[in-house]
Design a protein with these regions (language model features):
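Acidic, low-complexity glycine/serine/threonine-rich segments
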Residues: 1-171
Length: 171
């Protein structure tokens, strides 16, 4: 993601890059990679332009949801199907600055045969331990109607461990 630096009096561009580790988890890029990119870009930039290559904040998230099934549906099976569908929704990594449409999660769950209604979807910041140390007040970036979780231009959201970071309650 390339963003014009609004705080700069010069023609400065901020280029945010992120890398993946061997397990396909997001990680900061090495100084060597940043230097190689900067060297390559220098041959194409205007003389007055400056480019800063920066790491975005990696915000690890967790998704909690509550749903209702009819009395004839096996609740364990419904929960497993629902979690799998949300995992499929997050198979591709998000882009830097890309919002999360909470309504898509509602839509995916509501379209399941096993689910009668989705009563709640909540996205929570996971940090520390196995997760990034970065924190972000997600409520501040959630739309007033709760449909979209916006992302600052220097942030990338990651569902790092889909098998652990999606939890649901079925009633």
């Amino acid at each position: 993601l390339i963003v014009r630096d609004q705080d700069s009096f010069k023609r400065n561009l901020n280029l945010y890059i992120v890398s993946e580790d061997a397990d396909r988890n997001l990680t900061t890029s090495s100084p060597l990679l940043k230097n190689n990119i900067k060297t390559w870009l220098n041959q194409y930039r205007m003389i007055n332009d400056t480019i800063d290559i920066l790491d975005p904040k990696i915000i690890n998230i967790k998704i909690n949801f509550s749903a209702v099934t009819d009395t004839s549906t096996d609740k364990t099976e419904a929960l497993n199907v629902a979690i799998t569908e949300i995992q499929d929704l997050f198979t591709e990594k998000l882009d830097i600055g890309q919002p999360i449409y909470i309504t898509k999660i509602y839509d995916v769950l509501n379209n399941l045969d096993e689910i009668v209604d989705v009563t709640n979807v909540e996205i929570i910041n996971q940090n520390g331990g196995l997760y990034s140390d970065e924190t972000l007040n997600l409520k501040q970036y959630t739309s007033a109607d709760g449909r979209i979780l916006y992302s600052p231009e220097n942030v990338i959201y990651e569902l790092k461990y889909p098998n652990l970071d999606i939890q649901g309650t079925i009633r």
